[in-house]
């Protein structure tokens, strides 16, 4: 019996080409891939470091508003072929990122702590209290 295909990892630059479309040849290839991911014929694992790099690049370099960034990424995370151990955590973090002024990494940490019933060490009382995360100072 053949082994099921494992999801493949994707780099930030592929997702950027898909969202921004500033390199026509690469955009065409990235779009083709993402269409397969959308219909589930291809599976991708999008790690949190890639999401963080995407957000930073879209905010700082392309000056995309955070709500637009979150919406675009949440759309990608709704594709049938997006798989991975942290997909749920990242999706929750993106919703928090969209609705607050808290940076994505803190939203991700809060989402992970909440989903995995963990206590988070931080000096950032304000943000983690707003995200309703169990946290404590070291």
Where are these regions (language model features)?
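Short active-site oxyanion
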Residues: 40-44, 81, 115-119
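Residues that scaffold the ATP/ADP-binding catalytic core of kinase and kinase-like folds
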Residues: 17-19, 57, 131
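Short, well-structured N-terminal submotif of metal-dependent ribonuclease cores
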Residues: 1-46, 61-71
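Histidine- and aromatic-rich ligand-binding microenvironments
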Residues: 11, 45-47, 102-103, 124-125, ...
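Acidic catalytic patch
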Residues: 22, 45-49, 70-98
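Acidic, PIN/NYN-like endoribonuclease modules and their adjacent C-terminal/linker elements
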Residues: 1-7, 110-138
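Alpha-helix capping/helix-boundary segments
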Residues: 14-15, 50, 89, 109, ...
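Short hydrophobic/aromatic patches on beta-strands that form ligand-binding or substrate-lining surfaces
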Residues: 54
């Amino acid at each position: 019996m053949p082994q099921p295909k494992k999801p493949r990892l994707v780099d930030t630059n592929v997702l950027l080409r898909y969202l921004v479309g500033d390199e026509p040849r690469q955009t065409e290839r990235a779009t083709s891939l993402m269409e397969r991911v959308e219909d589930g014929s291809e599976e991708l694992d999008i790690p949190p470091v890639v999401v963080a790099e995407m957000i930073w690049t879209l905010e700082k370099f392309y000056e995309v508003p955070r709500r637009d960034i979150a919406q675009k990424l949440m759309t990608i995370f709704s594709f049938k072929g997006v798989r991975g151990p942290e997909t749920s955590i990242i999706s929750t973090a993106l919703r928090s990122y969209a609705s607050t002024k808290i940076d994505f990494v803190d939203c991700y940490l809060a989402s992970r702590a909440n989903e995995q019933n963990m206590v988070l060490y931080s000096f950032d009382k304000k943000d983690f209290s707003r995200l309703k995360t169990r946290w404590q100072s070291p």
